[in-house]
Amino acid sequence: MFEAKLANAGLLKKIVESIKDLVTDAPFDCSETAMSLQAMDSSHVALVSLKLEVGLFDTYRCDRTINLGLSLANMSKALKCANNDDTCMLKYEENEGDSIIFTFADPKRDKTQDVTVKMMDIDSEHLGIPDQDYAVVCEMPAGEFQKTCKDLSTFSDSLNITATKAGIVFTGKGDIGSSVVTYSPSSNTDDETEAVTLEVKDPVNVNFSIKYMNQFTKATALSDRVRLSLCNDVPVVVEYPIEENGYLRFYLAPKIDDDENMD
């Protein structure tokens, strides 16, 4: 049996809305310690990695490790039935068929609503993500990163990122013109959520598809902060922490010689 209860359905809504345009079918792995997901996008260019630890849930029970295959479009439809501040219970019993039950409860109205969603058989390939020692780790306000990607996509299909100890520079350059956004590390800020921090072992200069970066920034709703882990010639990691008990990470391979084909 698997049963997990979130205090706010809104959190699960935000997670699903962040990834449903990248990943169609989601193989959720549920264990005693966490509910997690790892999946490539349909073009096999980007990898999505989600982890929701037990501490994120009000109650959590998983008798044995199981895989729950769900269409994210169908999951989104189910979650649209919930108010953001409803509680959300996910329940699956192996002897009761191939469906998962979402129960939304509104304590203010003494109301509950059950939505049953059919599960799917999904071939989930666990991709080994090698441990990487990154040359640059940058943490910044998630809203700033989202705006930067959106602004630069007006000028270019590619996002160039360069970073040194002096700062991190985002550049979009195209036929109609260009835009450059520079962030220096914040030396003193009263609000930690607004700080830009940089750890630089070696300088980096890398190019990525800005279309994918704009997709990733849909996760801005989940977190005030975003972490970019960068190294020349290896995939970038764009990470959004989920409260203090989980994360949503996106991995994207760099573009080679500004070529659109990133496979």
UniProtKB/Swiss-Prot annotation:
Keywords: DNA replication, DNA-binding, Nucleus. Transmembrane segments: none annotated. Residues 61-80 bind DNA. InterPro entries: DNA_clamp_sf, Pr_cel_nuc_antig, Pr_cel_nuc_antig_C, Pr_cel_nuc_antig_CS, Pr_cel_nuc_antig_N. GO terms for molecular function: DNA binding; DNA polymerase binding; DNA polymerase processivity factor activity. One of its GO terms (biological process) is mismatch repair. It is found in: Nucleus. The keyword Magnesium does not apply. It holds the Pfam family PCNA_N. HAMAP family: DNApol_clamp_arch (MF_00317). This protein is an auxiliary protein of DNA polymerase delta and is involved in the control of eukaryotic DNA replication by increasing the polymerase's processibility during elongation of the leading strand. Homotrimer. Forms a complex with activator 1 heteropentamer in the presence of ATP. Belongs to the PCNA family. This is Proliferating cell nuclear antigen.
